[in-house]
Structures are given as C-alpha cells and as structure tokens.
Amino acid sequence: MEPVLALEGVAVPWELPYDTGLSGVSFALEPGELATVLLEASHPLTPLADVASGLLPPEQGRARFKGRDWAHMGPDEACTARARTRRVFAAQGWIDRMGVDGNLMLAEAHHTRRRLREIADEARGLCREFGLPDVPRDWPSEMREPDLRRAQCARAFLGEADLYLLERPEYASGPDLMPALSARVRGALGRGAAVVWLTTEPGVWRDPGAPTARRLRLSGPLLAEETP
C-alpha cells in the first residue's frame, strides 16, 4: 500500500511569507496515521503544508501524494488530487470578496456532485459543532480571528478527504474547540485518511486527543522525529 503522503529529502529555501525554509525533510504517512509537528513559536509559518499539497515544488527532493509525485502531475491531475486534500491554513485562506458561507462550501460544491442543500446542511452542522451559531454569511474581513479559525475547521472537515493538513487549527480559538477538533481527526483517521497537525502548543503536540503515529519537531528548516 502506498503512503498517503511521502516527503523525501525535501529542501525549500527560505523566502517570504514563510518564517523558515526546509532542509532534508523526510517522512511518510500511511492511511489512518496522524503526525503532529511542533513548530517554534517564533517561527510558526512554514512551507511544509504548501509542499505537501503540491502548491510549492521543492528545490530538492520529492513530495508524493498517494504514490504520485506532485511535480510530475499535469494541472488537471494535480487539481483532481488536491480535491482529495483538506486544509486549515496558517493564514486566512479566504477569497476576500466572497462571503464566508460561499468560501466554506465552494470546494465541496465544485469537486463533488452532492446537492447544494446537502452540503449546506452539513456545513451548518459542522459550524455548530465547532462553536459557531450557524454558517457565517459575513465577509471574511468582518469576522474575528477566533471565529474565522472555527469556520476554517468546519471547511476542512466538510465532505471527506485522503489527507488533512491542519496548520495550528487550535490557534486563537480557546480550549473549547479541542474536543470537536480531536473527534473529527479521529473520524478522519478511522476512514483511512492521513493527518498532519502543525502546532506551536507542546500540550497539543504531545496529546492531540487522537492516536499519534509520528511526533515531529521543526527547528528552523530541520525536521526531527521524537522517539517515545
């Protein structure tokens, strides 16, 4: 069985908007595996998720999704593959001139044949699960950061995917978010997805509330695995 995600000797030079580059990064995740990655609090913006989702080609090494090197995929194949990934972005990741509701449901509506009402009902349930009263209809610029983070979590778990890239999903949202977030991660793992959870919180890194296959620590551009 091919790993869901495999990074092999990945190197990315440092450049803005990131706080650091990557050097010799290698790890793989099988279906149903979770990796938590501890980031330095002073350098939380890393290109790791962009590389893992095929948005940033590494200068050296390979990034493979379900056995296919992102660098060898054509635009259509990469788009189809990326539809099987979900993400909570370190930055906002919103289309500015679209309501949060449209942002939240756009990918699922575009990449599946599900009825819009079905998608909207699931989105509403997820928003409530993550502590919002309903699917927000505000512009992203009109919402508070904690509520946007909750909406990002709802968007990430709308529908199903093979790979979840969660960049500090708990950031600015308070401890009440964690039970719902951990439950959704456990559900994704149970369906055979792989999850990468990046965090600056040592407590979350050690115990994200879900079985953890790998604990990784990013120090500058270097990624090291912590042994039990």
Q: Where in the sequence are the language-model features?
A:
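ABC ATPase NBD coupling module
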Residues: 69-86
